[in-house]
Structure formats: C-alpha cells, structure tokens
Amino acid sequence: MSHSHPAGLLAAYNSLMDKHLAGYFNNTRIRRHLLRSGLITRSGRILSEKEYKLNMMKRDHQKYIRECLAQAIFHKVLDMERYHQLEIKKKLETLARKERIQRFKGEHTRRSVENNMPILSPHPPVGPKSNRGHSVLVDEGHSSPLALTAPRPYTAPGNMQPPIRLQPLPSNPAVETVPKVTSRSRSKTSLLENEALFPIGGKKAVMKFRNSIGNSQRMNSYQLPNINSYMMPIPPPLPPTGKITRENRSETWRRRRFRPTTAPNGLEPLLTKDSRRIHKTSLHSNAAITMIYLGKNVHLSSDNPDFRDEIKVYQQHCGGENLCVYKGKLLEKETFQFISKRHHGFPFSLTFFLNGMQVNRLSSCCEYKHRKGSRLGGKRGYFGFVCVERSSPCYKCIIAMGLDKKPSLPKSRKEKSTEKGEELKKAEGKVRKEREYVIPKRNEIKENKTSVSAKFSAQEIKTGLKEVVTAVEEMTSKGKPGQEVLEDDQENTLKYEYEEDFEVDEEKQGEKSNEEGQADVQMNGIPQSPLDDKKDNLDPEKESETSSQKAPDARDNVKDENDGCSESELEEDKQDMKTASSTSSRSHPYSSDSEDESAVGDREAHTDSSTDESARRSSSQELSENDKPRKSHLPIEESLEIEIEDQEITKADVETKPMPIDESFENVLKEGTEKGTQEIAEGLSEKSGKHVSAEEKEKDKSKLWEESTAQVKDKKAGLPGLEEGGKDSLPLAYVLALGAPTMNFMVDETAAINSNKESQQLVQKTYTLEKKEAMEEDEAPQHRDADIVQGKGEAALWGEAGAVHEAPLRAWKPTAEQPELAEEFTEKREIPPGIERGAEGAAEAEGVRRLGEGGSDPIGQAAAKDAVGLSKDEAPEKQALMLTVLETDKAASEGEQGLEKAVLANEAAALNLEHLHEVAALREAATSEEGEAEGGVAVSDVGESEEEASIDLEDTGPMEDTASKREDGSEEAILGGEEPAKERKEVMRTETRLSPFTGEAEASRMQVSEGSPEEGSLAKEAFLCKEDVEGEEMVTEAEANREDDRKEILPKELDLARERRKAERPKTSLRKTDSEREEVTRANALKDEDAFKEEQKLKAEEGETETEVRAEEETKAPPNEMGSDAENEAPVEASELSDNPGLLGEDSLKETVVPIFEATPGFEKSLENITALRKEGGGERLSEARDTEHKDREELSSRENRALKEGHRQDGEGALAAPEAEPAGKVQAPEGLIPATGQAEELAAKDHDSCAGLEGRAEGQGGVDVVLRTQEAVAEEDPIMAEKFREEAVDEDPEEEEDKECTLETEAMQDRNSEGDGDMEGEGNTQKNEGMGGGRVVAVEVLHGGGETAETAAEEREVLAGSETAEEKTIANKASSFSDVAEEETWHQQDELVGKTAAAGKVVVEELARSGEEVPAAEEMTVTYTTEAGVGTPGALERKTSGLGQEQEEGSEGQEAATGSGDGRQETGAAEKFRLGLSREGERELSPESLQAMATLPVKPDFTETREKQQHMVQGESETADVSPNNVQV
C-alpha cells in the first residue's frame, strides 16, 4: 500500500477511499460502525473530513445543549421543590400561628367564662328561677361569648342565636324562664367550644357543639367535640305577642335540611355560610357508648370479697396504638359509658379486659351499627351494648340502610305567601286538634313507661309499631294538604324568617323537651346520628309535627333501635307521601336544638316546661283560630307515632338495664304523671276543646314530668350511681328503668357536665398555672444556673487568685530547699561533660536553682517578675505589698517546700531559657521582696549596694592576695559554713557534670559572686569584646552611681540598716522560712554529708593525686582549663551560695540573678558562648575538674571538719599570721590528702600576706561573714561544728566574735547580705552583698549576658591561655576581696571603713577609668560585672572592660598570677596550684583554711591602706603585666 502512495501523499491519504480497503469497509458491521461514527452517510457516501468535523461539532453541540437542558431542568425542579417545601413550611407555620392565636383567644374566652362560675356550677341553680335570677345570666350568657367569640352582628345569617331584642319581656311570666335555660346552655356551649379549640366559632359553633355537652364530663378538653349535622341552633322564646309567622323560615330550613346524608359530620352544607369560622371538624367520632357488664359465667368462692370486677376497655382509634377509653370496677349487670375516640374512616375496634385478662374483642365498621344494643360474644359474653349516642353511620351503614337516597326536593315556591301561611296555620290547627285526642293516649303510655319493669314486653313493641303504622297511613291519606303547606312555606319569603325561626323553634323546644319522651335518657342532649337526621328529613309528617315538639332524633333513634332499617324505609315512603317536609324540616332542627337545650339545661326543666306550655298555649290559640279539620290527622299521626317510638325506646332501654331502684322512682313518677294528667284535664276544661290542643296537654304533661323529675332529682341526689364527671352507669340505668323523663337525667347530667366543666376549667387553670410555674421554674433554673455559673466563675476566679497566691507561695517558699532538690535531681541526671547541651544544662541548672528559689510556677514567675518590676521600677508601696504577699506565701508554704522542690526541680530540669529568665525575675522579685521586708530599703538599694560592691571590687581587685584569700575565705565560708551547701555543691558539681557548661556558667556566675576571677574574666572579656562602648558608658555610670551611693551611705546608716535587719529578721516570716529551710537543708546535708564524708575519705587520696595532677595540668593547660576549673569551683560555690540560704541567701542570689538577667538580654547567647568556650577550651578538663571538684568537695566535707577542729588552734595564732596560719590550716586539714591544696593554700596565704592590710580586712570581713555563714550553716547542721566555727571566729576577731554571736538569723542575714541581696537594707550589708552578689552577678551575667560573652570568651580562651587564668584569678581575687571588704564593712559597721571604702572606691574607680591600665581593666571588669548586676547593662560593662583593654587585663592577670601575692609569687603554676587547691579542696578544704585566714585577718587595717594597697597592686600588675600580642583580643 505504501508503494502505491508516495510519502508526500500520505498526509492526504484516506483509507475509506482506498480501493484496497473497499471490501473491508463494505462489511456490514464495519459500515454500521462507520455510520454510527459519522464517517459515512446512510447512503454510503464517504464524508469529507470537513463535513465530519462539522457534524461532530454539531453533535457535540447538541449533546451540550441536551446536558444544559437536563441540568436546567434538574435545577428548576430542585428550585421548585425547594419553593414547594418553603411554601409548605410557611403554611405550616401559618397554621401553627393560627392555632396558637386561637388557643390564646380560647384561653382568654375561657378566663372570661370562668368568671361566670355560677353558670358553670355543677349544682342546680341556687337562686329563684325568676327574672331576677336569670337576668344576669342572660346577660352573661349572651354578652361574654358573643363579645369574645362572635364579632359578627346578631342578624348575620350565620348567627342562629336570637338577638338580644328577642329576649322575652319580664311581663310574660310563662316565657321568662326560657332565656335562662338558653343562656345557660349557651354559656356552657361557648365554654365547650373554647375548650374544643373553636374559639372563634361564634354562636353557631356553640350550637353545633352543644350536644356534646351532655358527654363533656368524659371528654378530653383537647379533643374536638362531634359536629353533627342534625344539631340546630336553639330558637329563642316566643315573642310576647304570641304571633307566629312561620311561612318565612320554613323554606330556608327545608333547604338547609336537605343535604347529602353522606356528608361528613363537620362539612354539612347547613354551616357553609359560617364554615370559614370553623376550620376543623372533629377528629374523633366521639360517640357516647353505653354498655353493660353482664358478669362472669363462673363464680369462684375464692374470689375477692369485693364483688366488683375491674373492667378495662381499649380502643384502637386509628389503626395504631390502643387507647384506654374506660377503666373502672363494676358489679354484674352494671352499665358503664365511654366515649369512642375512633377516627373517621377507621373501624370501631374495642378490646375488653376483665381483671387484667382479655376476654373479648370487637371490630366493626362504626359505632352506629351497635345502636340497637347487642350482646358481645354470644350467650356467654361478658359485655353488651345498651345504647350508642351521637353516633353517625359510616358510608357502609348508610348504603346498607338506604340512607344514601337523597330526599325529594321541595317544589318551587308558590306565588302567594299569604295562602301558604293560612294553609300552614290550618294544618297546625288540625295537628293540635288531633293531638287533643292523642294526648290522653300518650299520657297513658308514659304512665306505662314509668311502671315498666326490667322486662320489656314484645307485645307493647308490636302495639307501638302498629300504632306507628296506623299513624303513618293516616298521615299518608292526608299528605296532600301537608304538601301544599310545604309548598306554601317554600314560596314564603325570608323577611320574617329569622325571628320566626326562633319563635317556632322555641315553641318546638318546649314541647320537645317535655314530650320527647325522655325516651332516650342518655340520648338527651347528645347529638344523634345523621341517620336520625335523615329520618327526620324523610319523615315530613313527623317533622311537621313540630308543634308536638317531639325530639325527632330521639324518636328516630328509638325507631332505629327497635325497627332498624325497615323504619328508615318506612320513613322514606312517608316522605314520598307527605308534603309537610318544610314543617318537618323546621321542626326537626328546632326540636333537636330544643332537645339539646333541654339536655343541656335540664336543671331548668320546670322553666322549660312552663315556657313550652306558654308557647304551646299561644301557638294553640293561634292555631285554633285557623284550625281546619282536614289537616288534623297528620299531626295526630305524627304525635302518636312519636309517642309510640318514645315508648318503645324507653322500654327497650329499660329492658337492657337492671333497675335496682325502680319502685321508688316509679311511685314518684306515677304520682307526678297522675297529677299532670289532672292538671291537663283542668286545663282542657278551662279552655275550649278547640283551643286546647294536644300540645297543651303535652305541655302540661311535660310540666308534670319536670316536676316529677325534680322530685326524682331530689331523691336521686344521694344515689351512688350518679357520679359527676364519671361514667353515669347507674343513673342511666335508673332513669331508663323508671322511664323517667329525659329531663330528670339531663338535669343530673348537666350538673355533671357543669361539674366537669368546672373541673376542666380548674384543670385548665391549674394547667395554665402549672405552665406559668413551669416557665417560672424554667426561668428560675436558668437564674440558678446563672448563679451557679457565676458562683463557679467566682470560685474559679478565686481559685485562680488562690492559685496566683499559691503560685507565689510555691515560687518563694522552697527557695532554699528546692535548689538542693534541683541539684540532686540534676545530680541524678548526670550527663557527660562534653555535651553541647551544656548551655541548656546550665540554663536548666540555673533555672532549677532559680526555680528552687523562685518556683517554676508560671504564676509565681509572673508574680516574681511583677515583684521584680515593682522592686526596680515601681513604687515601694506596691513592692511592699508584693513582698508581703510573697513572704506570707513563702512562710505559709514551708510544708510544701519539699514536694514543690522535687516538682520544681523536675520541672526545672526541663525549663527553657525563657523559664530561666522568668526564674531570674522571680528570684530578683523574691530577693527584692525579702530585702524590702527585712530592711524596708527599696530594691533600688540593691543596685546601689551592688554598685558599691563593684566599686569595692575595683578597690580591692588589684590585690591578688586579697583575691586569693577571698577565694579561700569564700570557699572556706562556703565549705565550712554550709555543709548543706556542700551537698548543693556536689549537686551542682553533678549539675556541672550534667551540663559542664552549665556548671561553668554557674561557676562563672558563682565564682564572680565569690570572687573567683576566672569565669568573671571570661565573661568580662566576652562582654568587653562585644559591648565595649556600652560597657564603658554603663560602667562609668554605674561607677558614678556607686560612688555616689557609697558617698551617701554613712556608717551610721549602715549600722542602722544592719540593726534594722537584725531586728526585722526574726520578725520576717521569710527569714524564718529561710532559716527553717537552711535547717532542713542542713539536716539533709548532714545526712548526705555523712555519706559524702565517707566517700570523700575513700576518694581523698585519689582526689589529692588528681588535684596534684590537675594542678600541674592546669598550670600547663591554657587558661581555659583553669577558667573551667575555676568555673567548676565557682559553680559549686555559687551553687552553694545561691542554693544555701545560709550562705548566699536565696534572695540575694535571686536579686542578683534577676538584675543580671534583665541587664543581660543576651543571657542565652552568653550561655551558649560559655558553653562554646568550655567546649573549646577545656570541656574534657572541665569534666575532669568537675569530677575532681566533686571528689574534692567530698573530701572537703571531711577536711572541713578537721579544719574546723584545727581552726581553733589556728585562730589563736594571730591575725597577722594569717598567711602562715592559713597555709598551716589548709595544710593541716587536707595536707595529707592533697598536697596541691597545700600549695594552693600557701599561695593563698602568701597572697593574703601581700594583701594583709587590705585583704586581711577584706577577707577578714568576708571571711568572718563566710565564717558566720559557715557557723550558721554548721550550727544548724552540727552544733559542734557551729561551736568550733564560733570559737575560730572569736579567735579571729573580737568584732567578728560579736558578729558571730549574733543570732543565726543575723548570720543568715549576713549570709544573704554576703550573697548580694538586692534588698540590702543595711547599706554595709549591701556592699557586702554586692561583693558577693556582684561577683555572682558577674557570673550570672556571664551566663545571661551572654551569647556575646560566650563567643568572646571562647576566642579569648584560645588567645588568653595563660594570661586568662591569672586574670581570672585577679578578677576573682578582686571580687572576693571586694566582697570581703564589703562584708567586713557590713560586719564591723565601721564608719571609717565605709567612708574610706567609698573614698578608696572612688579613687580606684577614677584611677581605673583614667589609667586604663590592665589591672584596672580587670578591676573594672569586676566592677563592670557588679555594675551590670546592679545597673543591669552587661553590654556596657563588656564594652568598658574591653575599652579599658583586654590585652592589659590579660597581661595584668598574667602578671598578677605570676606575682601571685605580695610575696612575689608570680608563678602561674603557683597560682594555678592555688586554683587547683581551690577547685579541688576549695569548697571543702579551703573553708577551714579560709576560716583560719580570716581569723588572722580580723586585724583592721585602715581601709585607706587597703585601697592604697589595692592601687599599688593594680599599678604593680599593670607594670608587670606582659601583654603579649597573642593574648590581645580585639
């Protein structure tokens, strides 16, 4: 293929066109594929590429459009659905809102009705049934419900109640009482209406629900009453005129009556006009079912003596859960009643339980089916139906009974309404006439009824049926006139319809309520089924019998019960034959209404009867005028039929129920009946036979019945069966058995209803109250919750406050002990010496120490910082407050110190440098607080004292011997004075091992604090290198400040301050706490010391050997190593000082530390730098030195004891023999152990000799201070040791002796002062503290100040191998001498010394500042550090020191080291040996030697001489300083 197509044509090649592939593409499957792909047309034409692409584009476009449409449709559907849902939601919300509004309105109406409690009372009316009695009731009945529920005018078509204008006039006594009944019934119905959630139904709704009143005692207030179609409004009483124009209204009622029988109860066309006002139909059937408990077939003797059985009836109302509709205990043959809650459309399903066991089930289409009464379960059934009231047939029953056939509509109106009226009147007259004949019969029947026994004779029923048939036939024969009347009525206009409605209805009502035959006692006032309504509609004859006032419903119901559907058919036939449908239609609604009314207001039966009678008379008079014989048969037949039905109903009811009280009631009723008959006869005789119609007789009879009913009521009042609000089983039975008129039972029932209503109202009231209470309770719990929350919040706040307070407690209490724990903890966590983590370890160690002193609690730290800030920057008042709080916390938390120490130590190990800063701040705060609390001196004095101390350092700095002695003395003080400090030293050494650089940093800090120059020099060099300018400025300022401060400080002030301190110390809880801590610490230290001493004894020889070797190594080693050794020593010492409150006073350390931290923002850097220095210079040696130091310290603890013992001897050797005595002491104590220490001690002794004047004093003072501290520590630890120390001190100097004799608290004060308490209130003490604290501050600044210092120190160490050691010694000596001098000044309170010191300090500072010599540089370094500690600017110190000349420092230090002491010992080796001695024994061994040296030093040369010697030393050092360019560091 390729050969037939050149390569150039390959691009245009189309395989479809290739003839070689034609066969392939002609394949059906392939063609189908090509066609589907759009490459060819259906005809087989090959599409060009352009067409193909176009088609594909179109196809894609179509696809896209389809997708878009689909998506649009989808979204549209979603939107529509969403909108639909929103609409549904809105509708639901609207409905809910309407219901809520209706409920509120109903509640309002209910409240208004509740005000009319007399109307609703369950007892019969108390007042007379006269105009006076009912006038108010009428007003209430009409005004309150109408005003609240019927805003429409009275004449509105929907308002079926008579307007107020139609109220009967009081002049008509026969009619007066009727409105009362009406009003009462209306008020009741309005109440029921409101309860039934029809608050705005108006009067029509009231009328609709009136029939449910008789049953309301068993109805739930939340359930809608049954709305039955046959319930009509009650007409008003007849107008006083007595005229009735009925033609107007017959047509409308006829129209209203004829409606589909299948229409549901609540949707009847009769109420279409007002349907908008009644939104809901009844949810339940609400049929009142009366049943009888027939009893068990088998009775066991073991049954409970209570013969009653527990009956429960459950109904499945809507196909779901069963409801208990009845529960009670019944005797056999006892009836009970309950309300069916069947939902429309669901079957009527009942389950019967007897004593907890299910005995029967019933499931039928509706309640109406059982209206005739039947026994459930056959012959052996336990239950039977007595009657079913207010039941409406379901569709099935309607169809089965043929009730679905609509009645024939009336003919069109006739043209002449007058003829209609005449015909109607004639027909009514005939009815009346015929009634005259029927009434006697009826009376007889009623009498028979009353005497009816429990057995019902079938013959009577047959007779009644026959009579009914006869009456129907007669009515049929005379139906045409009735039809004409009906037609006339239909043609009649509506102008008088409204009023006449009520008038005629009133008339009917009277007759009905009396004649109705009380037949359905339980049916009374209870709506009857639509079937009955239909029957009424279908029986025009009966309905035309309106005048007879029979309750057609009751009558029909009776017929239904007796005859069933046959009667309904009969009625239909009658309807076809009769034409009086209009009359019947009118009569039926009104009769039903009147019946309802009579049922409701039965308590006023007499009134009703009288009203009915009067109405009848008036109507009879009217009718008699127009009476025509041809129309009489129809009413007569109807009345007969109705009477017969009533009789039958009553008999049937009576038959089904046992009547235990028949006789008494029968007698009463018989008597009443006889009386009534007599009265009727009289009435007939009085009136003409024409006018006296059967109605009158019936009225009289009803009257009589009512009277008898009243009597029966009186008798019945005590009957047990009458249970108000309960199920009236017995009363119904009694009434039925007696055949008593319905009025009788209705009175009771209405009373029960009233009671029920009252109870309902009460329940509602209580419910409302409960609601309110519940709401209030809901609110109350909210308030309570809020209160609780507030309380909790307050508690939490208080707790926080407490925590804040407690935090300070923790922060300040365990200062003394915590350092030990922290150190021990650090000791346990030994870390190899070379770890770079050393800086962090140092930070941690320092943090531990500070945490131990200041607490690790961040709150405590914050408080400490606040306290620091207060002490430095804020008013002393706040400081005092803070201090007081902190001190109090400190004192209070002594018991927690141990635990807190451990915790703080653990936390301290993990603390960051930030925590260290915070700790430093805490310490400073603590120290400042202590200082303030002790002396009341502001913390600012600390800076001054530190400045002074730095000046003193400068003054004394030039003197190496003094420095060496100072080291010795300080170390001796440390070692001898604080065996707990030994532990701390050891711990710190361990810490040093853990973090060699930490140890070094601490060493630097603590060496400086104790006068050890090495770390100070390194740190100073570092600072000098990086912060020359600032150092110079700050140093100058600091020096000037210090000079000024010193000038200001007077000896007397010093004395006063010291005295004040001494006086305050015992008072201050802090000090007590400190002393206690010291005691605890020393106790612990003693325990540890014993172990350590043993270890030291074992390791002593090794330590000596190591010390010698180390001394040699260090002598050979670069000054970095020496610095590290010194650092190691210093950290130990510093740790001792800082940890042991006896020596350094936590507060002083804290204070010095805090200013250092604050002054030295580069603390972390310094730590790192120092770490680097130590790593570079002598990490290994440091570790070794630390090990050696540790051993040395262990040995020192034992040597210290020896030194203490020997110290007594040496003390007596004389103060001037200090150089000799000191070496002697030192050699005596550790000589056998460490020869190098002996050399170091000799060097120290020589140094002391060279500085005998000044350093003798300085160290005498410092030594005394240290001795005192030692004594204090030892005294606390070991009384013997304390004694020895005191003896030594006494030997050394009487003043020292006196000072030593001061209480331990004073010693602790001095210790704290010597530590460099920023709080130094005694300014001499302040100097001493600055001496100690200054050095320590330098060390701390070396730690904190920094990164710069560390870097610079690293470089310096490399460069300053030899000179650095000497320089550090010099610095340390200066610091120590300075601190010694400060301490001596503080101790002895020598005004001269203070003044001289101030002057000498000024001179030295000035000389140092002017000369810029090497030694002055070193001195200034010390001063600078001290100044930094006091002023808080390490940078300035560094710069000034560097400006002064690091080279000279190095050289001068080298020379100083070479010079060693005034004796000419300038050998670095000797100095290094001395250093080694210090490093190994210094803390333990040197302490006794230094004590001895101090004992010799107490000689008090003038401070001026000391200063001069210092100056000479400085000059000599500067002259002898060999500044090699290698040592120079830019």
From Swiss-Prot:
One of its GO terms (biological process) is cilium assembly. Pfam families: DUF4590. Residues 581-592, 834-845, 1213-1225 have a biased composition (Low complexity). Expressed in dopaminergic and serotoninergic neurons. It comes from the Eukaryota. Residues 415-429, 531-545, 552-562, 600-616, 684-717, 773-787, 979-992, 1039-1116, 1173-1212, 1464-1487, 1502-1511 have a biased composition (Basic and acidic residues). Interacts with CLTC/clathrin heavy chain 1, AP2A2/AP-2 complex subunit alpha-2, and PIK3C2A/phosphatidylinositol 4-phosphate 3-kinase C2 domain-containing subunit alpha. This is Glutamate-rich protein 3. It comes from Homo sapiens (Human). The gene is ERICH3.
